[in-house]
Design a protein with these regions (language model features):
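Acidic, divalent-metal-binding catalytic cores of TOPRIM
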Residues: 1-208
């Protein structure tokens, strides 16, 4: 039973063995990882951030997503000339621009700079932190909370002093960045802003 003759031999039918499907892999941002993880050709749209630490944190959490979408994150090195830089970039429906600035407080220089840009293909968002370090949850790096530093004192130096850390800011940044393994280690306001910027620039119309 269960046998049949094929080319003179008795053979049996067997169900094809299927590889067991494991759970979907997730990226650090919480997205389902794509099977094809090769980077795509960069799209013309861009995301600009103010500092290298901002760029490194975004790469740490959203790097896989950005490479898959073909979105490049570039460092502004200061936003004083933002309006002129936006004009030079020439945003349009095929080439959108997302900008992440430090906290935009009413009446601040950054707020005035952002107000100079009025273009439907540009989205400017901020995060509510004095420094991008604060966007990392204290618990992720083993502290109760980020220390308060008086206005006028260097924030990074003040934090290191109050935490009793002897390292210089660049070394401490590498340490705390290494503690970030996913979006769960980052404060919600930054997560929301970055996700909105990615959604905005990836929604640009394809070029003909």
């Amino acid at each position: 039973p269960g046998l049949f003759r094929h080319e003179g031999d008795l053979v049996a039918l067997r169900a094809k063995l299927l590889k067991k499907q494991g759970a979907s892999q997730m990226t650090a941002s919480g997205s389902i990882a794509a099977e094809d993880t090769s980077a795509r050709v960069a799209l013309p749209s861009r995301i600009w951030v103010e500092g290298i630490h901002d760029a490194e944190l975004i790469e740490r959490v959203w790097g896989d997503d950005l490479r898959y979408e073909g979105i490049v994150v570039e460092q502004l090195e200061g936003a004083d000339d933002l309006a002129a830089m936006v004009r030079e970039f020439s945003p349009n429906s095929h080439q959108r621009l997302g900008v992440l600035l430090d906290h935009l407080v009413d009446g601040s220089k950054e707020t005035r700079i952002a107000a100079q840009v009025d273009d439907p293909n540009v989205l400017i968002l901020d995060h509510p932190y004095v420094d991008i370090w604060q966007a990392i949850k204290p618990g992720a790096i083993g502290i109760q909370g980020w220390p308060s530093v008086p206005k006028g004192e260097s924030w990074k130096e003040g934090v290191l002093k109050r935490l009793g850390v002897a390292a210089a800011p660049p070394q401490f940044w590498k340490h705390i960045l290494g503690k970030v393994s996913s979006w769960k280690d980052v404060e919600t306001p930054l997560v929301n802003s970055v996700e909105q910027l990615i959604d905005f620039v990836t929604a640009a119309e394809p070029a003909d």
